A protein has these predicted regions:
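Active-site beta-loop-alpha junctions enriched in small/polar residues
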Residues: 27-29, 56-58, 84-88, 124-127, ...
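Short charge-dense sequence patches
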Residues: 14-21, 51-61, 86-95, 111-114, ...
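Glycine/proline-rich, positively charged
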Residues: 43, 47, 94-170
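Generic hydrophobic/packing signal
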Residues: 70, 83-85, 89, 107, ...
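N-terminal binding-site loop/beta-alpha segment at the start of enzyme catalytic domains
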Residues: 1-80
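Short acidic capping loops at alpha-helix termini that bridge into adjacent secondary structure
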Residues: 20-21, 74-79, 83, 117-121, ...
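Structural motif corresponding to the early beta-alpha repeats
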Residues: 73-101
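A generic structural signal for short coil/turn motifs at secondary-structure boundaries
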Residues: 30-33, 90-93, 131
Length: 170
């Protein structure tokens, strides 16, 4: 499988992250105790040269399955994890969760669930237009500075806010 390069930062230095050109989405790994299903799928994708897995805290047991699989295979150093946060919780689906505090919480929970100390890519799964872009980007940058995240992204944002975030990030 071919690779593409994503730029990131690690320990204050620019890095290049070589990601397979096909991302394995892990939304199907939502069930608890799903390693009988998830393990062979993850193994096959990895054997084909795939190395990047897309997951999210909101995907319930997906992060747990990927973390357990990496732990069983001892392959964390060969895996690229893209996870997402900032999604409303199921119990309060109408309450936005894109705040500096929720970003930190989601990354912390994801790292624990994935059994790792960092993710290569972290994206916000939603937006909260009631929160200014600046504090959101500052929170994301802090996670990069702290080494918990190497590159950041956005999902489901309106174009003007994406432009503002990009200008803030440059």
């Amino acid at each position: 499988m071919e690779k593409i390069i994503v730029n990131g930062r690690k320990n204050g230095q620019k890095i290049e992250i070589a990601c397979s050109n096909l991302v394995m989405g892990a939304g199907d790994f939502l069930r608890a105790d799903n390693m009988d299903f998830a393990g062979p799928v993850l193994d096959q994708y990895f054997e084909m040269g795939g190395n990047i897995f897309d997951t999210a805290r909101h995907y319930r047991h997906s992060e747990k399955a990927i973390g357990a699989w990496m732990n069983m295979r001892g392959n964390r150093d060969s895996v690229i994890i893209q996870t997402k946060g900032g999604h409303p919780v199921r119990e309060a689906s109408d309450v936005p969760r894109v705040t500096p505090e929720a970003i930190h919480e989601d990354i912390s929970v994801s790292l624990d669930t994935l059994q790792t100390d960092h993710v290569e890519l972290f994206a916000l799964h939603r937006d909260n237009p009631d929160v200014e872009v600046g504090p959101i980007m500052e929170a994301m940058h802090k996670e990069v500075e702290d080494g918990r995240v190497y590159a950041i992204g956005l999902s489901n944002w309106e174009l003007p806010r994406i432009i503002e975030a990009n200008e803030y990030a440059v």
